[in-house]
Amino acid sequence: MLTVENKADIIKKYQKKEGDTGSTEVQIALLSARISDLQSHFDLNKKDHHSRRGLLKMVSRRRRLLEYFKRTNFEGYRQLIADLGLRR
């Protein structure tokens, strides 16, 4: 589960300016953290199909955001995927 402190740390790390919570980088980083938390949840709960659907929705949303970010800011995109450890 993503705690308030973890979420604040992620936002602080990827924000462009003070109070920035909705930029593409922040959204992608938060989704990546939630996705990794859910993946560890599925190691213990293999039959939790309702949460799996939510995971798939988050993955597709992150994929769309990454495609948009790649189109608009390619250098930032390359740095972000390297920083988050995503394979693309």
Curated annotation (Swiss-Prot):
InterPro entries attached to this UniProt entry: Ribosomal_uS15, Ribosomal_uS15_bac-type, uS15_NS1_RNA-bd_sf
Protein name: Small ribosomal subunit protein uS15
Record's subunit section: Part of the 30S ribosomal subunit. Forms a bridge to the 50S subunit in the 70S ribosome, contacting the 23S rRNA.
Stated family: Belongs to the universal ribosomal protein uS15 family.
Cited function: One of the primary rRNA binding proteins, it binds directly to 16S rRNA where it helps nucleate assembly of the platform of the 30S subunit by binding and bridging several RNA helices of the 16S rRNA. Forms an intersubunit bridge (bridge B4) with the 23S rRNA of the 50S subunit in the ribosome.
NCBIfam families (alphabetical): S15_bact
Pfam family, one: Ribosomal_S15
GO biological process, one term: translation
GO terms of molecular function: rRNA binding; structural constituent of ribosome
Cellular component GO terms held in the UniProt record: cytosolic small ribosomal subunit
Species the sequence originates in: Dichelobacter nodosus (strain VCS1703A)
UniProt entry keywords in alphabetical sequence: Ribonucleoprotein, Ribosomal protein, RNA-binding, rRNA-binding
